[in-house]
From Swiss-Prot:
One GO molecular-function entry: ornithine carbamoyltransferase activity
Protein source organism: Listeria monocytogenes serovar 1/2a (strain ATCC BAA-679 / EGD-e)
Lineage of origin: Bacteria, Bacillati, Bacillota, Bacilli, Bacillales
Protein name as catalogued: Putrescine carbamoyltransferase
SUPFAM superfamilies: Aspartate/ornithine carbamoyltransferase (SSF53671)
Gene that this sequence comes from: ptcA
Principal place of residence: cytoplasm
Amino acid sequence: MNKKRDFIDTKDFSKEEILFMIEIGRKMKESIKNGHYPQLLKHKTLGMIFEQSSTRTRVSFETAMTQLGGHAQYLAPGQIQLGGHESVGDTAKVLSRLVDILMARVERHQTVVELANTAAIPVINGMSDYNHPTQELGDAITMFEHLPKGKKIEDCKIVFVGDATQVCASTMFMATKLGMDFVQFGPKGFQLREEHLKVAEENCEVSGGSYLITEDVDIALKDADFIYTDVWYGLYEAELSEEERMKTFYPKYQVNKELISKAAPHVKFMHCLPATRGEEVTDEVLDAPYSVVIDEAENRLTAMRALLVYFMNPYVKEAGFAVAEKYDAELELLLRNGAGL
């Protein structure tokens, strides 16, 4: 019997497995844009646990399940006994008998880890205080769609501007997994921690990528292909007032036209959204032709479809790359013939 796998952290997957997920997502995106909805998840049910509110995560997962023939069950805060009257472990065991896969967006990373360790079904991390792996996958798809002409992903540099949020950490995890050069341009005290850098170092040893943490804007932005930012209050929301946040990050770490001009001419701007206009990014940048933030939001759906198929379709129950290649051929044929409509 094959060991159950979960999507808690991309460090648990090889570069080849991540690239395969990306390819599944891109092929299904193309198929659906052409009006073909492969029913790969027919009769499957996703249970969605939310300790935090969400727009993109909830809508993306629900839409993905519907498009592929399945059903999503929303479990809102206060509607289930997660960690309250009922333990996290007991909740996981019960839901394992009722649904086929779980997604959890939680306040503490340990909660989703405990769900995964106890559940008999796959568990997907929809975001925790440590990382945001589904965002990682959607962002990777977006970068592949917007690669500079003549460049491979391994040739690209991505710069994260600002606070060391879980999205910043996840951006580094994915970039170094893919062999990219990653830079965090942020102030001391708000830079990625040693536990994050250890993962990046391990990734780079395998992929040939690199990482750098700096307060020097010119070093950070030189030849950047992608610039990414997030809100300024991620992990430190309870520690800093709005006035203190602005004093720490503004204006040096605001993504504006001047900062963009220091990057490569073909640079693309990324943001996980929602954005606080006028703080971490100006309207001029967020709405610019080089901004790909709406593509990113759409590719959350692309990523969710890929993950759900990867973990629930029988061809990829075992995630070895040989199986991935076999399923790749099956999916190619299915999409070409428009089967399952």
